[in-house]
Amino acid sequence: MNINFESRNITRRSFLKGAGVVGAAGLLSACGGSKSNNSGSTAASGAEAPNSTGATPLKEYISWESANREVESWNLLYSQTLSDANVVTNLWDGLMSFDCYGKLVPAIATSWEANEDSTVWTFHLRDDVDWVDCNGEVKEHITATDFLVGLEWVLNASKNEANNTSMPTLYIVGAEEYYEKTKDMGAAAADLRYQDMLDAGVGIEAPDDYTLVFTCKDPCPYFDTVASYTSFYPASQVLIDELGIETFRGCDNTNMWYCGPYIVEEYIQGNTKSYIPNPHYYDAANVSRFERLTVTMISDQAIAFQLYQNRELDEIDLNESTITTITSDPNNEYNSQLCEKRARPSAYAMHFNYQKNNADGTPDVNWNKAIANTAFRQCFYRGLDLKAWFSRYNKINPLKCENDYYTMKGLCYNTQGVEYTTLVAKEMGFDAEKYDGETMIRLRANGGDISALKKQAMEELSAIGVTFPVKATYFIIASSTSALDNATILKQCFSDSFGDDFIKLDVQTYVSSLTQEVRTPQLQSFVINGWSADFGDPVNFLGQETLHDDNAFYSHYYSNIARVAEAPADYQKDLMDAFEQYTDLVNAASAIVNDTDARYEAFAKAEAYMLENVLVSPTYYDIAWSLTHANEYSKINAMYGGCNYKAVNWETSEEAYTTVQYEQFAKAFDAAIQG
């Protein structure tokens, strides 16, 4: 694709608006106020940005996002997807945030403490936080009452439709009962207010305007990590009353209220979002912000590379072909600028669909029978060699991307300092195996030989009428050649690992929304999706796959196992037994509240059971190579929550960072973590 890049006498932002880099202008949504290049410059003044190299920092910054990750909800209380949180985290603050080391730091809460047994947590709030509208005009003052309103909204089934209830109902006294009450009330629950929640005995109170107290069901020494999640964000009753429940639930950048570091200057759906500083941000004096931050939607990494070369982007991740182009030419200027990023705090997995439909809406019985078979699923975890596919994400060190666990590494540690996934590895029997750059760890025991499992699966499935090869339908966004290239490599991995007589990958496309076009009609055989923790405990991962829980995200929205449980077929009996056993193990682990080590050991057993039965098949960690004008190690790096894309205190440079500089950043970061 040829792109007519602009001359340097107009701004980069003007180019992006005019070029329509993803091919569709979408809907223009903007609020009032100046659109000049100086807009927000006064509000941006505050703390100096970090500068460890003496470089000239950037005042404006242009980042990117994949075209298939467009924001779908601007309401953090309602949304459960990271692609939404990555946007709205810049607009809406909660009790706490995080620093570049992943440590909890104050946001609207200035400090917090727990009682002796960690059942009562008290948060002390700032007295200088305001809601502003999309024009940056102050609308209301934020007090502890706004957090009561926010929690009532989340717990009210009529208002928030069961979204984001798992954290409060799991931990807060009376929260589950209040949620069930509103669920039973139906539409009438829409009339309830926060006082009704308090009267029902939910364990939250506001003794004064700037104090918030939570009472937990059981001792919870990590509750501060729970309270950092969006379930506990504030909301304004004034705005809810003004918009009405349905409009507030579906609010957008033009009618929402802001209390974060930025407001949206302009939003062109499917194209760009531009943010300017919130002129009334409470922490303006203590954080650095950009005068303008633009996020460009990118449908193709080849286009992204062209944009970066012309300084229409300030950072890009590099795919395999671009790295090959750079490294194959010793004179290429970018050879010295290749920067390996740290792993994003997400664990990606292959989420099987246990109730797949055909395009005409009829059940895909062949797939549904096959995926219900244990031996069939075990072939994915024990035999699918993904090294070539990992190379699409990390050409230089592909096996650094290998993920053998459902829970993300680094989420939590027991009292002996043992990282949780090492407990899972011990249960799985490969705790002694280390990264060698050559072979996937989970394939070493049998060399990836699944001939016996394959024979068993084909015999058992043939007996109930399954025909081979089984077609595994995998959807990618139609506009991305990079996604097609990735899928082509994945298809070859299937062929090499399974044989074309057993399982064949069928690559299909969707236009713009995976949710609306694929997941809702249940057309996929599997989706490869990442989960970032909401708080610092394994239940936040493992609880998403359990039965009998309205809040189990993947069970309801990806695997559809919750629907299968309503009326399982005979061939799904063993599958349901496995999910019931897994659910029991998770619930038993979750019930251990006074012994952290025993709790994590029990969760590790539950996770090992999940992996042995391959209810989900882990795939990769996102460890990319990049070209960048931002120091990745200066950005927020939280292991949980949705704050990592909050653009404050970023170290940037007019000149691109070099490989050597990034190695120095990594060493300094590791030393700070270990020290």
Report each predicted region and the residues it spans:
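Alpha-helical secondary-structure segments
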Residues: 139, 143-149, 209-215, 261, ...
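Gly/Pro-rich hinge or "lid" segments in bacterial periplasmic/extracellular proteins
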Residues: 187-201, 207-211, 215-294, 655-675
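N-terminal secretory signal peptides
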Residues: 1-10, 14, 18-28
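N-terminal lobe/hinge region of extracytoplasmic solute-binding protein
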Residues: 63-117, 257
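Detector for C-terminal structural segments
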Residues: 379-426, 478, 482-492, 518-675
